[in-house]
């Protein structure tokens, strides 16, 4: 598995509850651009329309050696999931007020582009502060243990 890009902001802004692996419908130049320069997750999210899941605002830069048929960098991209998974996502988003965000995009062992999406709940400001405090405490404990070995 070769990771192309990760959404680092997702882990600090959301509590990740479940993750799913989804295929993504891409054009030829998009795959070449992913191999060449990666992707940008800034402000990207998933939306469900007519029983299909779409990934919005994922920026895949244009392929340098492309021609007139080069792709639009921020076009909506359809995610490929099983129908049961889509129904489960619809239920969670509608009933519990959760959101679907992309966390990682990568090439699997067969060379196909996959997106890891997560069902997540947004963190409040005080939740973020608690996470920072926990991280600092763990860092201090580890530092103390290293010094006293």
Curated annotation (Swiss-Prot):
Keywords: Cytoplasm, RNA-binding. Belongs to the SmpB family. The keyword Cytoplasm applies. This is SsrA-binding protein. Transmembrane segments: none annotated. Pfam families: SmpB. GO terms for biological process: trans-translation. HAMAP family: SmpB. Required for rescue of stalled ribosomes mediated by trans-translation. Binds to transfer-messenger RNA (tmRNA), required for stable association of tmRNA with ribosomes. tmRNA and SmpB together mimic tRNA shape, replacing the anticodon stem-loop with SmpB. tmRNA is encoded by the ssrA gene; the 2 termini fold to resemble tRNA(Ala) and it encodes a 'tag peptide', a short internal open reading frame. During trans-translation Ala-aminoacylated tmRNA acts like a tRNA, entering the A-site of stalled ribosomes, displacing the stalled mRNA. The keyword Ribonucleoprotein does not apply. GO terms for cellular component: cytosol. SUPFAM superfamilies: Small protein B (SmpB) (SSF74982). InterPro entries: SmpB, SsrA-bd_prot, SsrA-bd_prot_CS. CDD domains: SmpB. GO terms for molecular function: RNA binding. It comes from Thermosipho africanus (strain TCF52B). It is found in: Cytoplasm.
């Amino acid at each position: 598995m070769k990771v192309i890009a990760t959404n680092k902001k997702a882990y600090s802004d959301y509590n990740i509850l479940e993750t799913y692996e989804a295929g993504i419908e891409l054009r030829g130049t998009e795959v070449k651009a992913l191999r060449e320069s990666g992707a940008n997750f800034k402000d990207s999210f998933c939306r469900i329309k007519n029983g299909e899941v779409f990934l919005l605002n994922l920026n895949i830069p244009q392929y340098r050696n492309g021609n007139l048929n080069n792709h639009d960098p921020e076009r909506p991209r359809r995610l490929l999931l099983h129908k049961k998974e889509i129904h489960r996502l619809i239920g969670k988003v509608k009933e519990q007020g959760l959101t679907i965000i992309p966390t990682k995009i990568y090439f699997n062992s067969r060379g196909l582009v996959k997106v890891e999406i997560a069902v997540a709940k947004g963190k409040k400001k005080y939740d973020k502060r608690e996470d920072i405090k926990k991280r600092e405490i763990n860092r201090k404990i580890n530092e103390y243990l290293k010094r006293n070995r």
